């Protein structure tokens, strides 16, 4: 295995420039699906998409967590890994990881500058034919392949952006195709039935490959199975060839016994909460077994070491303990239900303060109905909703969220509305801290909300100035709003410190993906 060290030198100006150039390109939802533009780009770069074997992952929920588990297991086998996932929480470099860490700023910027002339050539070729230039997601997919070839890596873990057949990542030939649980999401792009969505996702199954599927709705499973047979691919399904044998709660996560394709693995510690993460672990284990051929068990000590190192930011992530603050990026009803079950099991709170923001293309009514069922109808806990929005142009306005929550059956007395996320967070945390019984804050509903909350809460209390999902000029204006001052004061109060004025240049941060980005929320 090749070893490489990186200078730990951040380059925020370079990242901001490159990210701006990416954001200047069209988002995926503004054009018809295609693969020829990405295929042309990777070909003129020397077929960089063939530089390493690929494990390709699609599905509706659990893709990123499964990708991280696969990565960790491969790292435990001393393989050099490249992982491509989307979207990011705080920095665009998170989308492209080497050996489990975001690619260094210097590498991200250098490789982008090296491939940009070739991307421009493809842009010109397609423009001459009256077709759109490379989009944001097409371009960053090509960048990922180029970085993985530049490193190089031993194996690529490749997460689909949206769908499968027409996703930019599908120019790669995955030797293992992983399908996480499939449900209804992105219906505006993939179709409004499970059959249509499953057919699209089955498109990543390659000839003579290996399909590893989570437990699925029978209609979905049938489509995946038929596709695998047509492609002469091997296949294995959770609950049939592999799965979770036993599961028990443990401090900081859970203890699992997993049945893989070729062996059983008892007492595996997974530092993530929830039955759904146990199922993701079984999916990841089977995928890695399949990568190594599928006919021999892996060494238990290596599997144990791999799972012990798994982290999945923004997935039931406890970011603060006093008061308890948990972030979860679930953004559709299926994901919210799984996360809610896990949250209640892991934390057993008597008071739940939920800060919720949802993007416009999502099933907001379905999300609120699940929240009501999980936290109001089926528990004795006190539940309050703090409705707000990220800075994404796609975010549903808090007042509109309130109407949807009321339609979902929530009592208006437990709902409060905030124009700014920092204010909603601050008030929810203050209320949770001073409850007489166990209380905590759950932030959920959107990857963009989670990313912004993570940035806000990761800062020292006296420096907690809101970093909005906007361009730098807008950030400067936002840094002086009343809500920012309130957030800083309350955060300082919670930390027992006096708030102090922060120089404007210290309050600025890079913009997160906004409405010009790919609409995917993994």
Where are these regions (language model features)?
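ATP-dependent carboxylate-amine ligase catalytic core
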Residues: 10, 40-50, 76-172, 188-190, ...
């Amino acid at each position: 295995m090749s070893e490489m060290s990186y200078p730990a030198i951040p380059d925020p100006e370079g990242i901001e420039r490159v990210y701006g150039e990416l954001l200047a390109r069209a988002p995926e939802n503004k054009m018809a699906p295609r693969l020829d533009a990405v295929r042309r780009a990777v070909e003129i770069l020397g077929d960089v998409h063939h530089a390493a074997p690929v494990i390709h992952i699609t599905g509706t929920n659990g893709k990123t967590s499964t990708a991280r588990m696969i990565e960790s297991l491969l790292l435990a086998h001393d393989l050099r890994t490249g992982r491509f996932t989307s979207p990011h929480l705080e920095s665009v470099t998170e989308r492209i990881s080497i050996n489990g860490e975001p690619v260094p700023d210097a590498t991200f910027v250098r490789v982008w500058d090296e491939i940009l002339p070739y991307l421009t050539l493809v842009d010109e070729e397609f423009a001459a034919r009256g077709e759109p230039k490379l989009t944001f997601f097409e371009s960053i997919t090509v960048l990922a392949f180029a970085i993985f070839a530049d490193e190089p890596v031993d194996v690529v873990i490749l997460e689909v952006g949206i769908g499968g057949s027409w996703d930019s990542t599908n120019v790669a030939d995955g030797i293992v195709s992983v399908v996480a649980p499939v449900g209804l999401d992105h219906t505006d792009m993939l179709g409004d039935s499970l059959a249509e969505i499953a057919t699209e996702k089955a498109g990543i199954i390659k000839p003579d490959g290996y399909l590893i599927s989570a437990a699925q709705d029978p209609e979905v499973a049938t489509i995946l199975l038929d596709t695998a047979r047509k492609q002469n691919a091997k296949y294995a399904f959770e609950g049939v060839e592999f799965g979770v044998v036993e599961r028990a709660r443990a401090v900081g996560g859970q203890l699992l016994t997993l049945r893989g394709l070729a062996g059983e693995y008892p007492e595996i510690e997974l530092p993530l909460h929830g039955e759904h993460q146990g199922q993701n672990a079984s999916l990841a284990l089977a995928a890695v077994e399949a990568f190594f051929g599928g006919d021999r068990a892996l060494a238990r000590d290596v599997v144990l070491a791999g799972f012990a190192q798994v982290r999945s930011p923004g997935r039931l992530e406890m970011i603060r303990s006093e008061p308890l603050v948990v972030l979860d990026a679930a953004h559709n009803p299926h994901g919210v239900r799984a996360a809610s079950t896990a949250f209640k099991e892991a934390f057993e709170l008597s008071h739940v303060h939920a800060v919720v923001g949802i993007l416009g293309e999502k099933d907001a009514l379905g999300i609120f109905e699940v929240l009501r069922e999980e936290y109001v109808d089926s528990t004795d806990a006190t539940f309050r909703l703090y409705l707000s929005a990220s800075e994404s142009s796609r975010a549903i306005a808090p007042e509109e969220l309130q109407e949807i929550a009321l339609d979902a059956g929530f009592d208006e007395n437990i709902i409060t509305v905030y124009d700014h996320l920092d204010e909603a967070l601050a008030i929810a945390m203050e209320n949770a801290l001073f409850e007489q019984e166990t209380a905590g804050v759950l932030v959920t509903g959107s990857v963009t909300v989670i990313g912004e909350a993570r940035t806000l809460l990761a800062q020292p209390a006296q420096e907690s100035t809101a970093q909005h999902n906007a361009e730098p000029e807008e950030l400067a204006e936002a840094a002086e709003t009343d809500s920012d001052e309130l957030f800083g004061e309350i955060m300082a109060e919670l930390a027992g410190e006096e708030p102090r004025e922060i120089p404007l240049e210290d309050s600025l941060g890079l913009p997160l993906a906004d409405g010009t980005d790919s609409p995917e929320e993994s």
